[in-house]
Amino acid sequence: MNRSNVHLLDLPNEILLTILKKLNNMDVLYSLLDVNDGQLDILAQEKTFTNVLDFGHTDNISLIDRFCIYILPRICHNIEYFILEPVFMERILLAAVYPNLAELKLFNFEQQIVSTYFTDELLLRSVFQQQITSLILVNDDKGAIIGSLNEYTRNIYVHILNFFKNLTHLNIIGPNIMLCPGLSLCDLPATTFSSKILTHLCIIVENFDDCLYLLDG
């Protein structure tokens, strides 16, 4: 019986896609996009690999460099959801224009991120205010250093709700429920934390009365 040598690139695109879908999409993009093979390059740009990009928990500078310089500008129109670390957020979001970006998840969120990035002076303002409809913050602020919970609520939680003008989904979670600052509304005006368009809210509250305040709002 004669053996025929079948190479990976001899396979139909449908089979190649099935194989590639079993891999991490970030690995597919990093390894195959912008390589000297038109077939793999085109396949790597499929939406299944480009609509959600997870840069969370990475400190690989060479990976960030390659994505920002070569990859993101080519797939920017497909990206709908970014998962990011604050240290790389500005660079990644400024690497291209993302017309379909609507969801953002941010790890290691701390209160100084609000004053640094969620401001009217930043170039990213239009992305945050006009495009983002779903925001997930993994809050890493420690209770011992935040001071008054009412003050934290006003300066952080209320500011976020007001700054992201098209937000319909807001999740603020913590790596540990005991370490995440709770929303504290009891001594604040009833309309302090309110939105006409927010339909989904997941947040830790300081006590049951704060939950009632939310329901009344």
Predicted regions span which residues?
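Eukaryote-biased activation of long, low-complexity terminal tails and linkers
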Residues: M1-G217
